[in-house]
């Protein structure tokens, strides 16, 4: 995955780290794989995932991935 720097976008209500996690989710990575890639704990990834789902008002990872693709994050 290319290392993209998330730029603040008022239409995307996520932190830079949440955006990174969402990109990884959209590529189909597991929580463990995301944690290893971003050098954070699996528990931190889980927290970010829950925050992402809440902030973008979706109920699962698949819907979050679709949301990310539609906004050009992936």
Residue ranges and their predicted role:
Residues 28-63:
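Recognition helix of helix-turn-helix DNA-binding domains
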């Amino acid at each position: 995955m290319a290392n993209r720097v998330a730029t603040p976008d008022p239409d995307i209500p996520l932190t830079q780290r949440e955006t990174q996690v969402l990109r990884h989710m959209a590529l189909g990575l597991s929580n463990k794989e995301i944690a290893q890639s971003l050098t954070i704990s699996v528990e931190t990834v889980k927290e970010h995932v829950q925050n992402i789902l809440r902030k973008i008002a979706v109920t699962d990872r698949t819907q979050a991935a679709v949301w990310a693709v539609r906004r050009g994050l992936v």
